[in-house]
Amino acid sequence: MGPDGKLYFNVGAPGNIVMPSYQQASISRVDPQTGVIETYATGVRNSVGFDWHPQTRDLWFTNHARDWVNDEMPHDTLHRAAKKGMNFGYPFCHQGDFPDPEFGKGRSCAEFDAPAAKLGAHIAPLGMRFYTGKMFPADYRNNMFIAMHGSWNRSTKQGYNVVRVNVDKKGKVWMYPFLDGFLTDPKGDPPMWGRPVDVLQMPDGALLVSDDYNGIIYRISYKK
C-alpha cells in the first residue's frame, strides 16, 4: 500500500525481450475505494521489490534487465519513480544507456528515464525495504536494504548478498555491502550456499532476511 492509500503492483514482461501489451512491463496502482486501476510507470521489465522513501515518499524499485546479451550487459537496476508517467525504457533501452540489440534500433536511450543506479549484470535484485528502525546505527535510518538473489546465466557468478543503499533527496545513490558470504566459488556448481530473497524490518528494528536455497529466515540484530 502506497502513502497515497492506493495498492501498487508490478506486471512483468511475458518473456525475456518482447514488446509488452497493455499493462505488461509496468507498475500499476488500484484505488481500493473505487476499484480504478491506472498505470503508474512503464518500461519496467520485472520489478520484484519496491518501497517508498520515508521522507520524500518517492517510489523506489528494483528491476531485472533482459538476459542473453553477454556476461556483463545489461545491468539490473535501481529506480526512483518520483511521479506518475515515467518510462524506464524496456524493451528499447536497458540500464539507461544500452540500446537493446533487437528493439533498440532507431531509438535513443535519451527518450527514457534513466535508473538511479546500476546494480550489476544478472545480479537479480529481489526484495527491498527502507529502514526506519532504531536498533541499527543512526546513519542506517532511511537507507534501503536490497536482497540480491544472484546470477544464474553468467559464467562468473555474482550477487548472493544483501546491500545497504543510501540515497539523498536528489536521488544520488551510495551502495555498501551489508550481508555477504553466501557466494563461495563464482565458477563453481553450485557457486553459493545461500540465496537472499527478501528483507523485512521487525518492530524492534532487527532485520529479517529470507533464503530460498536453504529454506531459512535469518534475523540480523545490532548491539554496540
Q: For the regions a protein language model found, what residue spans apply to each?
A:
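Hydrophobic, small-residue-rich alpha-helical packing segments that form membrane-like cores
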Residues: 1-7, 29
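C-terminal substrate/ligand-recognition segments
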Residues: 200-213
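Beta-sheet entry/capping signal
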Residues: 6, 58-59, 206, 216
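Beta-propeller domain segments
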Residues: 13-18, 22, 28-35, 45-46, ...
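Loop/turn residues immediately N-terminal
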Residues: 66, 214-215
